[in-house]
Regions:
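Bacterial N-terminal signal peptides that target proteins for export
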Residues: 1-9
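C-terminal motif of bacterial Sec signal peptides marking the signal peptidase cleavage site
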Residues: 18-19
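Short, conserved catalytic or interaction motifs in soluble domains
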Residues: 22
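N-terminal low-complexity, Pro/Thr/Ser-rich intrinsically disordered segments
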Residues: 26-58, 64, 201
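A cross-family detector of function-defining hotspots
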Residues: 39, 53, 61-109, 131-201
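Second-shell loop/turn segments in exported
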Residues: 50-57, 122-130
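Mid-length scaffold segments of soluble, non-membrane domains
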Residues: 104, 112-119, 126-129
Length: 201
């Protein structure tokens, strides 16, 4: 092989190696991390998400974390979960609603949140806009026919009786209606416990 042919061949090989080296990509950068919303971001949130949370308080949240995020409740009483197990009921008043309160039911055996009820507070609402004072029509238009309905007969001071209803949905939302058919309370609960929360239809 002649010297010039050998030089040409070496130049071609070097050129090919250089081309390969320049097209070789370095390691891919890691994908950006998607973080859960920080507790501070949810602190002033007033969204009721069925089966998940009410504002900054989540179902299954440890009691200690709930206090860190939401503060100390004004009262606590012994209670029972729908299945009969011991629980503690904690009450948080709402400064903007004199009769309003947030009631958090905590399992006694593991100190985690079982359900969260918003009573008579207009500022808490579902993504669909259902809130205290909303009509039964809006509830049904937003969530459809309830999977379960509970009824309670109440007697007024004048002796007249009226029926209050509670609509329960598999997504983990219970809606208590007053005697006029308007929303009185919203409760986020584990959807699988629907039949324990409301009497089956």
């Amino acid at each position: 092989m002649s010297h010039s042919l050998r030089t040409l061949w070496v130049a071609i090989v070097l050129l090919a190696l250089t081309a390969c080296a320049s097209t070789k990509k370095g390691p891919e950068p890691p994908p950006p991390k998607i973080e859960a919303p920080a507790a501070e971001n949810l602190l002033h949130d007033k969204t009721v998400i069925p089966g998940v949370r009410v504002g900054p308080v989540f179902l299954d949240m440890p009691l200690r974390k709930m206090i860190e995020v939401f503060g100390e409740p004004v009262s606590g009483t012994n209670s029972r979960m729908p299945g009969g197990r011991p629980a503690l009921l904690y009450r948080y008043p709402d400064p903007g609603a004199a009769d309003g309160a947030i009631l958090v039911l905590v399992r006694e055996h593991d100190q985690t949140v079982y359900s969260i009820q918003v009573e008579r507070i207009e500022t808490f609402r579902t993504r669909e806009g259902v809130r205290f004072g909303s009509s039964e029509a809006l509830v049904r238009a937003s969530f459809g026919k309830p999977q379960s309905v509970g009824e309670t007969t109440v007697t007024g001071q004048d002796g007249a009786t009226a029926v209050m209803r509670m609509y329960c949905y598999l997504n983990g939302l219970a809606v208590r209606l007053d005697t006029n058919g308007n929303v009185e309370a919203l409760t986020a609960f584990p959807g699988g416990d629907l039949r324990k929360i409301c009497k089956a239809q």
